[in-house]
Amino acid sequence: MVFNTGAALLDAIVLAVVSREDEGTYGYKITQDVRKAIDVPESTLYPVLRRLQKGDYLEVYDRQFDGRNRRYYKVTESGRTQLAMYQKEWKEYSGKISELFEGGRLE
């Protein structure tokens, strides 16, 4: 198993955060929610959003809010498939790490 704890972990977390809202959510809220889970600079997350959009995992649209446009992100079907793969890999990865931390042997 090869769970990349760098870019893939950020991608997985962002997809998980965005997928919680059926109609999508806006960039600033995504950064705040992600930062509740992991300590990452806000400036790191906007390139992640662009990468996920470019990979067709997120779709983007603008909506008026207080007289200004606010950019929203919504998970695509491809994004949901990718998130499911990340969730499966994470479950296996974290299970093995937990087993190791608890003194078990890895098979």
Mark where each language-model region is.
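Beta-hairpin "wing" of winged helix-turn-helix
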Residues: G55-N69, K74
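Short, hydrophobic-biased segments on the C-terminal half of alpha helices
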Residues: Y46-R51
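Amphipathic alpha-helical dimerization/coiled-coil segments
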Residues: A84-E107
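N-terminal helix-turn-helix DNA-binding core of bacterial DNA-binding proteins
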Residues: V2-T44
